Amino acid sequence: MNKGLLHNKLIDWYEVNHRILPWRETDDPYKIWISEIILQQTRVAQGMEYYHRLITRFPDIQSLADAEEDEVLLYWQGLGYYSRARNLHKAAQLMKNHEIFHLSNVECLKLKDEEIFAALKSMPGVGDYTAGAIASFAFDLPYPALDGNVYRVLSRLYDCEIAFDTTQGKKHFRQLAEELLDREHPRLFNSAIMELGALHCVPTAPDCHTCPLNTWCKALANNTVELLPVRKPRPKVRDRYLEYTIYITPERTTLIHQRKGNDIWKHLWEFVETTSVDFKNDNIDNLRGNQLPAALQGENSTQHYTTLHHSTQPQAISLTHVLSHQKLHARFVIKNVPELPEIPDTLVVSLSDLDNYAFSRLTLRAIEFLAQR
């Protein structure tokens, strides 16, 4: 393999075809770090909006570190995988007391590459890939950046049948990426190979005959492009049943509480959870009635509601919402009450103030229904 020619072909393609993205227009490590955390589990189109939101509200390490976690979660609301937001906040609090994160890029380049990489990797939520991406994009250091797009390009380029999301696979692909890396132009090379995977070497039906790397692509030669990359078997999605009560007073106040423990949606707010119940054998059809307006229906969520004849009697909203490892079946029972019950660890809030708190996407759909009542 003529790596020099491959590098040139790839970079030439990138110069003509790349997208204009805000984090590519800067070498600010903070902004690049924010973008990389967002893009860990989020597509660029959705991530762009959140990048601008976060950078506008938290323009530097100090402002992010000094914020309350609740506010960080609120600005993250809707992106999912909320541990990313919590780790972002924890990392900022560590960074503000860490000398290396207050140096200019020029001053950082006086340090050893390994020092910069180690400092980055020591932060919560930052692994090898994210540390390598920041080191490369902010400081132009010779570290590979491995995301899903790069795994796909490498697996096809080398016709590699090792599952990239296993311990063995991660080690193997990192070695391939380090060997292929253009060490004279790591920032440009990493941007180019990521963009190739995002725009050209796509999961299905890629246009291999116009690919700049087709001369070297072993999967194309062996007719295995559509079989790659290989992933480890995904765990079975399990059903989980939840029930909540939404108390509403004549003054339009309700009760919410903050989730604790290490379960899903840690530190997000929700209505009073009656219990984690198995109501799959209930006559849920009695709760369904009319379908919610299309505006309230998400790609991975189906929603139904029923309105009973008397406003003092309960109403119920039934929703399903799919996470990566769980299918949630939730029922929100709306109870109009003269006054709120006393329930430990709950907060009394006005319905009009709910947008000041961070909720899961599932609960947000219930809130959207409430707003239309």
Question: Which residues make up each language-model segment?
Answer:
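Catalytic cores of DNA base-excision repair glycosylases
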Residues: 2-4, 8-9, 13-209, 213-216, ...
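Intrinsically disordered, low-complexity, charged terminal extensions of DNA damage-control enzymes
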Residues: 1-19, 25, 198-373
